[in-house]
């Protein structure tokens, strides 16, 4: 079968009406396969299908995904426990960090403040900011958070298609995998449950990037084309600066896949020389170096300031056997229908693998990985849970469950390819289209599909408190939600303090998980309901707390103190305001301190009457102190930045947050890598002085074009 390059199909009607750009895009997508057939050692024949048909597979997944998340596309805050937090974080990043030309900075928004992107990078915030610029500021930040979550979910389908094609699945099988990936819904992250139930927006944004990274790394192993190396590096960098835990899980997943690849017997008629393995290892190493270079602007500051951090992952992880039973018998990661289909496909592929069926022959040395990588990854993650210290292992096994599930569904695509092996492309693509229609008509196949909608407004009392805080909390101050079991969730949002921080655009003493880690966290907000208000008073003054929000009966004891007054009493919810001005410093005997100036990264006090000033700023290495204009060495007391004064007289103390040498060096390294990989080759090609590799790359493109003219059908 041949295809003429003039646009006329030898076996069908002419296709001149199809736009040339669409045809070329389809051809590029169809090139997502390995360059050599594992059984013959030669280039497989290309499909004679027009380019537009090759877009059908990824397109089905995109359409299904958009339909499933249509409830959050119209605007407003999406459902999700943590969604208000991401709104507040993105708002501060857009206005105070990116708006000032920085990639990171000090954010006082939560707890006692932290470097905004020290633990989890700015990937999600950058995407939200880009969308805001693209819409000329007409879209509010709550809507942008919904769009970012929807983008991460919808993009999962074409990313899964790309990954499956890299593993040698046909277009039909890869399309089925793309649709099935939308049915993976894990509350710990990945899918609709994690995105619109818990609100793990950055995690979901990282999911398609993880799949693209794995697919590109597979191609790096198989193909000498340097473009795969670049794609793998860029995608890996994107995962790392978006969700660090996902990057670690990606490494674990690819290690499992490579172990399966290495352990798979070679059936190739034309055996590759040992040097091919060395060159593949070189390309993988190059991809790793490029990824580190591209992400140096964030990785170097992370390495410079790794902690300390309090424990934040406090939930219980069940034993391995119990977890497996939950995966198989409950809706932990998918509906029971999808679980049954996955197990049936996995069993069929395992039998084909044992008997050496031709159904898996096209997968080459990836056939074992397609069958076993999902279960093996889950085992590895549980092993790491018991080995890695602190929260790292716990986060990996919880956040990695969804990625293991995405590997589990690969056998479904293999079975789909087998079912349509003798059908034409136009007929075969009806299978993923039908599956997509079933998912749309029966959304219950996707756990938590009902959460993809606009969040329900909280009770009027909480909305009133938000308006009061917006009007009365000064920029240098913060409010504290007084936690009480059974009271916090009675107003609608699971985290009312996060909703108040978002709605009032105010800082809060309440910390939030691993993404807002402060070098010091007093956890005072959890003790305010039980300790004596007189004992809490100096701590609240040091922390800059100007307002308390909590149960009316609980705050009655604070309202009796001379320094507090009620500004809102609405049923069982009360807001108290501190009468004195904010000092953001610990009160000491006979010491008089006044806050002269405040900005997120520069604070100035006037103090007298003591020989030290204990500030309300965490003792973070990038905070620098000066006394009367002279730089001094910063000290710390109880985790707080402390200035040792020369005497008890009047002094001006200033704290300044400065970018470190690692920040500047990281940006410089990234710029050098970007210039070396993208800038210099372009200049050399334009001058006609490019290296031989550039010529070989061009020859490879020409060879691809020649092969595309030969035609064929890959099913």
Where are these regions (language model features)?
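Membrane-embedded transmembrane-helix bundle of lipid-linked glycan/lipid transferases
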Residues: 4, 9, 25, 37-469, ...
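Compositionally biased, proline-rich intrinsically disordered regions
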Residues: 8-11, 16-18
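Short hydrophobic helices that act as membrane-entry/anchoring signals
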Residues: 16, 20-34, 268
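Extracytoplasmic
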Residues: 78, 82, 96, 158, ...
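Intrinsic-disorder-associated, low-complexity terminal segments enriched in Asp/Asn/His/Tyr and depleted
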Residues: 704-706
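Short, Lys/Arg-enriched N-terminal segments with co-localized hydrophobic residues
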Residues: 710-712
